[in-house]
Amino acid sequence: MLLDVAVSPDDRYVLTADRDEKIRVSWATAPHNIESFCLGHTEFVSRILVAPGHPELLLSSSGDRTLRLWEYRSGRQLHCCHLTSLQEPAEPWGDKRFAVSRITYWRQEDCVALLCDSLPVVYLFQLDAPRQQLVYRQQLPFQHRVWDVAFEEGQGLWVLQDCREEPLVLCRPVGGQWQGVPESAVVRRVSAHLRGNWAALEGCAGGDSGLSGLYKATCDNMTSYLKRKEERLQQQLERKRRRTCPPGPAGRPRR
């Protein structure tokens, strides 16, 4: 089951993200020929993105709550960030399973933004290409569930959230930290358009992403097995007791 697709900038390779924990790199002219596999995720691979400006590097995310950096032609993993290690203990979703539903990239500063399914937060990283690693920068918290995020060159990070009164937030780096900027004429105009089509937007963007149903099923068979075993033993003991206690004169078991 394919969950995402990317094409290398030179159009030589097709990259596919799989529910079965792997990323496959195939030749575009002959997709049955596999160049490499990127292996390491322990859950479904939700999103992949070839880093703009760095055609040899691939970003991937997964239901295992990691962001990974690859040299995809060789299938070599360069770096892995565990998102759970970035969470504060007091955050209400600290123990919740989540997957990244969007990866977006700002080429101007090699900035990576991650949107996690159902969480009111956006994670920000910086790609250090010379050192082949991802550097965590900050979290952007929001009061409402975030539906989508996208960078616009020359503008900043657009954040679409589940709030009819304030559906759109524009964030920019200020003093080295990203933050929401005062509402501009552009934000007001686009927000007014979104409010006018809120029912359609809510039905589309506000729906379930479907990622929650992709996790591997884990069954605690031991508990049910032991219960059934105990029931069988009790039944066997009952049958044995009945066989060893023949009925008395009145048809009742002897005591």
PLM region descriptions:
Residues 14, 57-58, 112-113:
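Acidic/hydrophobic-patterned starts of short beta strands in beta-sheet-rich repeat architectures
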Residues 77-255:
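Terminal intrinsically disordered, low-complexity extensions flanking WD-repeat/beta-propeller proteins
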Residues 17-20, 61-64, 116-118, 162-163:
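Conserved strand-to-loop turn within each blade of WD40 beta-propeller repeats
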Residues 6-11, 49-56, 104-109, 151-154:
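Loop/turn segments within WD40 beta-propeller blades
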Residues 23-27, 67-70, 123-126, 169-172:
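WD40-repeat beta-propellers
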Residues 1-28:
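Fungal eukaryote-biased detector of long internal structured cores
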Residues 28-31, 72-75, 128-130:
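Short loop/turn segments that connect beta-strands within beta-propeller blades
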